[in-house]
């Protein structure tokens, strides 16, 4: 997942399909793609900058020197609020199966808190108040038999996969006749969970590009011709990356979402992929995190969980940053 952020396919998604304002910046001897998020409050324009997939050197003096240059360049224009860095240096990684049998949650939480304090002290960055890059990801190694893939899951997840098979649920690849239903169910899932999704035009263009250039595909679980869950995936080298999908809540008792992931693992393995990246979740040891429920499901599938530094802000305008941070938190509370 974290290599995906600076990959050509993501640049194409953001620039050509989602048509987001963007730019390029050199940091630590490497070119990085970044997004520009503009908010217009007449007659002013406020901007946030965001680069994800950044790797920083261990020499923190070099980090401070580079950040100073970024602040000088981007801080000159009034209305520029902050530059957010999604940092992918790894804190630790561990086997999800091992995590279920050993009490390591508290240790991993402590490691993250210590790393946060060190980064803030050594670089002058602030912990981002809006998380745009997940702080962890779960990767499934696919060089296993069907039985081994099931055995790696927790007992509840494995049982649900078996029940879905007994109920007659099937997993297959998307076809054009699935287009309208998939999009509608994806929209319903997004609305039900309170987050935004892409437009129909962007969705159609995304699928067209993925299939035309063999950069990804769509997996669907169904019963008697009814779509009950779906996943859009990207292909990157020998890794298949889960992007997003839907689950039809009317059919939760069929466990199609669980079987969909298992079927996706089988297909990817049989088609030469070595890993499946489940595209992020909550940091370990933070049950209050909004992605905790997402992580719980993904962790039940087995694999390795990797913890990364996460997102930090370089403040460009302290007054605007404080006002924007306060406004964002108030708005989040009002939505609850």
Model segments located where?
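Conserved GNAT acetyl-CoA-binding A-motif
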Residues: 76-96, 269-282
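Active-site/acyl-donor-binding loops of N-acyltransferases
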Residues: 2-11, 24, 42-43, 96-147, ...
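A short, internal acetyl-CoA/4′-phosphopantetheine-binding micro-motif in the GNAT/acyltransferase core
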Residues: 52-62, 143-144, 245-254, 282
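Aromatic/hydrophobic pocket-lining residues that form the small-molecule binding cavity
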Residues: 63, 67, 157, 203, ...
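A conserved beta-strand-loop-helix scaffold within acyl/acetyltransferase catalytic domains
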Residues: 1-44, 92, 122-252, 267
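Aromatic (often tryptophan-rich) hydrophobic motifs at membrane interfaces
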Residues: 69, 73, 205-208, 215-317, ...
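Active-site-flanking structural segment that lines cofactor/substrate pockets
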Residues: 26-54, 59, 64-68
